[in-house]
A protein has these predicted regions:
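Second-shell loop/turn segments in exported
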Residues: 52-59, 148-156
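A structural "domain/chain start" motif
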Residues: 3, 24-68, 72, 79, ...
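Bacterial N-terminal signal peptides that target proteins for export
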Residues: 2-13
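Compositionally biased, intrinsically disordered linkers/stalks adjacent to structured regions
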Residues: 154-177
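Bacterial N-terminal signal peptides
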Residues: 12-25
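Surface-exposed short loop/turn segments
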Residues: 34, 76-81, 88-133, 141-152, ...
Length: 177
């Protein structure tokens, strides 16, 4: 009799554990520290084309700097495989603006500060959810002292602007903030 009760107890514990495991598997909560809202069961790749520099003022390393920074952003903050073409998510575009503008005038009637602006046009295609496709223009600027040569501050300012634009693109495409 004791053996029969022991078997029922073990059977009951096994059944309860199986039921709990099934219930918890069905009710999963997904959380990402990067803020992405990617369904990795459906979306596995992102293609990021080179962004050619079509701006009037051309800084030759800019195209490569931006394209690589955007790829690096997706590599570091998602589990997506970054490929050159035909991804589940696809980013294409071009650098449409790279310009300097005097910002403020000093007492000697010369520019005291200069604004450097970077503008990039992006076309996003989501082959899994086409209703999320968009085309959008992104822009960032940095201000520097007009006494400085652009060649002395250009790479530092570009790194800041590229990171800002890459963050905006990332948020609009996979984080949806």
């Amino acid at each position: 009799m004791a053996l029969m009760n022991k078997k029922r107890l073990l059977y009951g514990i096994f059944l309860t554990a199986l039921l709990c495991t099934t219930a918890f598997k069905a009710c999963t909560i997904s959380y990402s520290f990067t803020g992405t809202s990617i369904d990795y069961t459906r979306i596995r790749t992102v293609s990021i084309a080179d962004f050619p520099n079509m701006a009037e003022f051309v800084y030759s390393p800019l195209s490569n700097m931006f394209s690589e920074a955007l790829r690096d952003k997706f590599l570091r903050q998602t589990r997506l495989e970054v490929i050159r073409a035909d991804g589940d998510l696809d980013l294409q575009g071009e650098i449409t603006g790279y310009e300097m503008m005097p910002l403020s005038i000093g007492p000697d009637a010369l520019a005291a500060q200069t604004r450097l602006t970077l503008t990039i046009n992006v076309r996003f295609t989501n082959r899994v959810n086409p209703e999320e496709d968009f085309e959008k223009r992104y822009s960032a600027f940095q201000v520097f002292d007009a006494n400085q040569l652009l060649s002395d501050v250009q790479d530092t300012l570009l790194d800041i602007m590229i990171e800002e634009i890459a963050d905006q693109i990332f948020n609009d495409t996979v984080a949806r903030w």
